[in-house]
Amino acid sequence: DFSKYSAIIIGAGDATGSAITKKFASHGYKVCPARRPRNIDKLNELSNEIIESGGWSKGFGVDARDEDSIKDFFAEVENEIAPIDVVVFNPGANVFFPIEETTSRVFKKVWEMAAFAGFLTGREAAKYMKKRNEGSIFFTGATASMRGGSGFSAFSSAKFALRAVSQSMARELGPEGIHVAHFVIDGAIDTAFIKETFPETYALKEKDGILQPDAIADTYWYVHSQHRSAWTHELDLRPYMEKF
């Protein structure tokens, strides 16, 4: 009975994050989507949609880079809503700057959003899940998790770091019954940003040539549902026509 547990989705944006939130809510979880406080209205819209469809949801405005904010968020969910069984770390932090135009401020902020915030999230999740020797901690990666593209020094280095955090946690927490996995999203996703910025890429949607958020969410649920004798710790997702 998943309704006895909560699922936290950090970075519950309009596409993938929302789809993952809805997916876990559809299976009965009390979902707790989180975004930056300035996006609380969008979170409320997401929660209302889930509630209207018969699920349970409460949105939280959280700065995932702030240690106290993350600690308080996890404590509230664990103690006032339901034991935390699933945590998905899904913030986007993608920026493009030639190396000479990459300021120290940009580099640090991207690292804070993609790597440091992931560490804080994983650590707090582990604290609560270890008490029960169960749970899933999932990190969303990208093409940049695997290779540093030209102009992506800040983003790639941060995503490399997040992948390392995930690998380390998987090895440490697996024997404790906690499933840690890293999802490499290798391709464009069906989002408003892609539609507006890369219309030629978005046109591939007619041929299933860009990743669909609901299909991504299906995979997260599948990995969460795996038997512990055959866990996946890293996988990559891309459209069938994507070159790799």
List PLM regions with ranges.
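C-terminal helical subdomain
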Residues: 175-187, 202-244
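Rossmann-fold cofactor-recognition segment
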Residues: 50-68
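Conserved glycine-rich cofactor-binding loop
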Residues: 13-14
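Conserved glycine-rich Rossmann-like NAD(P)H-binding loop of the short-chain dehydrogenase/reductase
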Residues: 28-44
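Catalytic loop of short-chain dehydrogenase/reductase
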Residues: 136-161, 167, 171-175, 189
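Substrate-binding pocket helix/loop in short-chain dehydrogenase/reductase
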Residues: 98-99, 103-111
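Active-site loop of short-chain dehydrogenase/reductase
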Residues: 5, 55-56, 83-84, 98, ...
